């Protein structure tokens, strides 16, 4: 077998890596030149001298806080093609006064989607799972300890000050580079410790690692997802033993971290591979953007940031509550913004039967001008999102369109604030913002974002997370 061609893939319009559109001489040159840039996704297709090509299929399982999807990807004549084969709903479940994830139901959906992929495409070379960050499953030996708490649960509220009494947040940020969020893994594990839940626990797996464990039996600890929780050293890219010791957490729970691209096992003949298992980590890998351009991964949360060579943990970043999360060979300097959570909750309360096209049209027609602080804690997990808006506004919205106009304008202004902070903290000006995810399909919000930030918005209505997941699997070969 010889390398017969190297092709450029995959987003319309196709982006070529070389100005003259010529292929690289060999696979090594291709790999050297294609990292860490994501100007284009490049893949090698190996064929015979006669040009016969055997298609290889890969499966990305991408699960968000409100839904999950299974997407098969393959390289067909130089074009990366994808097909969604399964989609399912997700959401928190209230159990004994706490918000939890039905992890067994998620496992069932993961397996069902895999079967759908095999029914349609036959042999699947490999699969990988990505999800949101910070949440985890505790294990006693091979048995899961339930419930699996969801990050919007309030169980950490009472222990934040206690944690910061043992290690000041300024020190925590300096060591780990992670912004303050009351649901960070560091606070959740401390709450478990206080409640006695860690007694006898032998391991904890982040949600995607647990789902892959249920497939192949291998316990893994992937780097990008681990960094979301406020426990990984920004200097060493491993768990910070001093933070762990300061909080009295069991040191044995914190294993060496594994990088994206690692094969951890097999499931019914398919390799199980670690992608960037934090969904934003995979999403950034899937964005075809200019080097060092800001991005917004717009879903339940909006993550706005840039790639940097190393973490930025200075005082300005701490005071502005910026985060440093692991990427595939780079750091993601970014900020969490409340995102489509606001819009989705308003819709579920005010107009669950309306399509988003109709909602956006009503928001555009509205003349309501007040806004809210989209990142206020009042919007994190309210009993009623509409009531939370009412309490924050001096003039009550008079229509459904008013609520949504307020929400969209508030999000755009939060993007503006974040971009201004980014430019101050990095000492650079940026001309464009690349937006992917569900929010990229909202032309009204994109226009508001352009007006608020003064930046060109490049909206890419693509499944960037799944594409990044697939890219990592394919590049492994």
Q: What feature does the model see in each segment?
A:
Residues 1-13:
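Extreme N-terminal basic, low-complexity initiation segments
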Residues 10-12, 16-17, 21-146, 269-272, ...:
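N-terminal glycine/serine-rich phosphate-binding loop of ATP-dependent small-molecule kinases
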Residues 59-60, 164-176, 190-202, 206, ...:
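Active-site core segments that coordinate phosphate-bearing ligands/cofactors
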Residues 118-184:
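Active-site phosphate-binding/coordination module
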Residues 123-131, 428-437:
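Short glycine-rich phosphate-binding loop at a beta-alpha junction
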Residues 152-162, 182-184, 232-240, 261-266, ...:
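A structural motif shared across PLP-dependent enzymes of the aminotransferase-like
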Residues 153, 221-226:
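Nucleotide/phosphate-binding loop and acidic/charged catalytic motifs
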Residues 184-190:
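A charged, well-structured terminal subsegment
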């Amino acid at each position: 077998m010889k390398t017969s061609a190297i092709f450029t893939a995959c987003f319309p319009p196709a982006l070529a890596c070389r100005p003259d559109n010529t292929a690289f001489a060999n696979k090594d040159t291709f790999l050297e030149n294609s990292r860490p840039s994501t100007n284009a996704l490049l893949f090698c297709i190996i064929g015979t001298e006669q040009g016969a090509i055997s298609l290889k299929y890969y499966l990305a399982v991408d699960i968000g806080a409100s839904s999950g999807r299974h997407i098969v990807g393959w390289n067909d004549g130089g074009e990366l093609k994808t097909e969604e084969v399964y989609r399912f709903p997700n959401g928190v479940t209230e159990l004994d006064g706490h918000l939890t994830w039905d992890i067994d139901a998620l496992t069932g959906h993961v397996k069902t989607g895999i079967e759908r992929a095999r029914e349609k495409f036959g042999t699947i070379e490999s699969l990988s799972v990505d999800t949101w960050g910070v949440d985890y499953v505790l294990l006693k030996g091979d048995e899961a300890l339930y419930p699996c708490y969801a990050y919007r649960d309030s169980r950490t509220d009472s222990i934040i000050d206690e944690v910061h009494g043992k290690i000041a947040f300024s020190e925590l940020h300096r060591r780990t580079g992670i912004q303050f969020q009351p649901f960070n893994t560091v606070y959740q594990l401390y709450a478990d410790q206080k409640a006695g839940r860690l007694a006898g626990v032998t391991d904890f797996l982040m949600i995607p690692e647990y789902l892959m464990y249920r497939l192949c039996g291998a316990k893994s600890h992937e780097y990008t997802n681990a960094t979301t929780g406020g426990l990984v050293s920004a200097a060493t890219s491993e768990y910070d033993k001093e933070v762990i010791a300061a909080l009295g957490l069991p040191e044995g729970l914190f294993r060496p971290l594994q990088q994206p691209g690692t094969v951890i096992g097999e499931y019914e003949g398919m390799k199980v591979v670690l992608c960037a298992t934090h969904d934003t980590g995979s999403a950034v890998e899937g964005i075809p953007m200019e080097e060092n351009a800001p991005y917004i991964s717009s879903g339940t949360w909006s993550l706005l940031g840039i790639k940097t060579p190393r973490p930025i943990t200075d005082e300005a970043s701490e005071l502005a509550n910026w985060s440093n999360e692991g990427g595939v060979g780079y750091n993601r300097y970014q900020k969490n913004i409340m995102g489509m959570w606001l819009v989705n909750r308003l819709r579920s309360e005010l107009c669950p039967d309306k399509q988003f096209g109709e909602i956006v049209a009503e928001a555009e027609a509205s003349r309501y001008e007040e806004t809210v602080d989209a990142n206020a804690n009042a919007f994190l997990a309210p009993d009623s999102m509409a009531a939370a808006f009412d309490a924050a506004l001096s003039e009550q919205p008079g229509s459904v369109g008013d609520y949504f106009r307020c929400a969209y304008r508030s999000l755009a202004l939060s993007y503006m604030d974040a971009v201004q902070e980014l430019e101050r903290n990095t000492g650079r000006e940026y001309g464009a913002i690349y937006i992917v995810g569900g929010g990229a399909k909202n032309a009204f919000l994109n226009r508001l974002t352009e007006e608020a930030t003064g930046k060109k918005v490049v909206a890419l209505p693509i499944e960037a997370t799944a594409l990044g997941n697939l890219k990592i699997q394919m590049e492994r070969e």
